[in-house]
Amino acid sequence: MRIKEISLRQDPDLRKELALLARGCDFVLPSRFKKRLKAFQQVQVQTKKEETLPPSLSQTIPTFYFPRGCPKEKVNIDAVIAKIERTFSQFPNERATLDDMGKVAKACDCPLYWKGPLFYCAGGERTGYVSVHKFVAMWRKILQTCYDDAAKFVHLLMNPGCNYLVQEDFIPFLQDVVNSHPGLSFLKEASEFHSRYITTVIQRIFYTVNRSWSGKITLTELRKSNFLQNVALLEEEADINQLTEYFSYEHFYVIYCKFWELDTDHDLYIDRKDLARHNDHAISSRMIERIFSGAVTRGRKAQKDGKISYADFVWFLISEEDKKTPTSIEYWFRCMDLDGDGALSMYELEYFYEEQCQKLDNMAIEPLPFEDCLCQMLDLVKPQYEGKITLHDLKRCKLTNVFFDTFFNIEKYLDHEQKDQFSILRDSEGESPEVSDWERYAAEEYDILVAEEAASFHFVLGSTEVQLPKSWICNLSFSLHEKISKISTNLNWFRLWIFCLEKK
């Protein structure tokens, strides 16, 4: 109950007490006045606060944060739904199978290869089909809550209750790409390679898109990446190898063959000794130890057993062959930052350079003293703070490959030393190349692998020697001994045998 704002002096009892106080008597405030005085003071304070508050501005500030995309006023949801219903009317009982979802995706104004996520999000995996009513209910909800492609794609793939994507969320989507893309048609008879190709693509997606290293792709990360643009290109580009950032089969082949050479027991795990054999022991043992320390790998089981998985190897190989990308710089920085303080000290640089000096001594090459090497690297990086190199310093540097190779890759270090320094500087100061270091490496290695296999597969039928066309080798790009073990069962090999007979 609000107390009226009146002076307490008007109270007759209080006036009597005040008169006694004026004559020199002690002032005794009756207990009944204490509550009234307290209520009076509270009203006065509340009135003062209300007077000092500025007028509310909430009505004048428009909404500026749209986590699911900015709403589009001109979108007519009913028209979109009507278009979808007309598409479903073409199917028996107005039910769409996975093969029909390409038309449905187009009716939704989505790229063709969203068809798998659309099908699975509407519950098609359980029944083998999607009814028009269930799909319309699902898509209407998405249109009402998701206002851009990134928000829609995440909603289609994510688990209920999540607002991010983990690696497992991409498997159904990529399996549909493997099953239906014309550039991967030769994989239909080699189902055992589906999971390995999918694993490779997933790791490349997270390598490029998941900039936070959290293992969870957020809406913001997806919007900042070019992944959805590459998904749209799947429809336009029949040659999967032209999509070099994520989906290239040739890149998968190079990565898998490099791993297969190291994985002697073929359990899809390698230990320290296996990884040390990469590129003829070019990587220092101290760096190998750091890779297995868990600084750049995930999974407690692998770390406990002292092994890394094929998925971890994908990150390693891409980082090793292209040390200029943000993720690769972060990868090697984590490895070299021994104490995890966010900076590379001179002691940490010396720790890795010591082994490089030992290798150079074994090769009868006089190593550069560490002090001189350090001066060169500081001139190269130009750190902001004296005595330490931060991640920001390395990302500003255009020759991070030279910096990292100096401390843990002896072969590439010697290559840099033999190069003309002016040409190195000229390359670093030029515009960003159209072909990255990784793409250049993958193309060269693929040509080498194809040439080696082409030389190995010469068939002699009578007096006629038949050499496999390159296209056959491309389509049958599996490991050599795996091919031999599948000659009797692989349909492609049967076709090849017919081809050889025709040549004869």
PLM-predicted stretches and their roles:
Residues 1-504:
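Acidic, Asp/Glu-rich intrinsically disordered regulatory regions of eukaryotic Ca2+-responsive proteins
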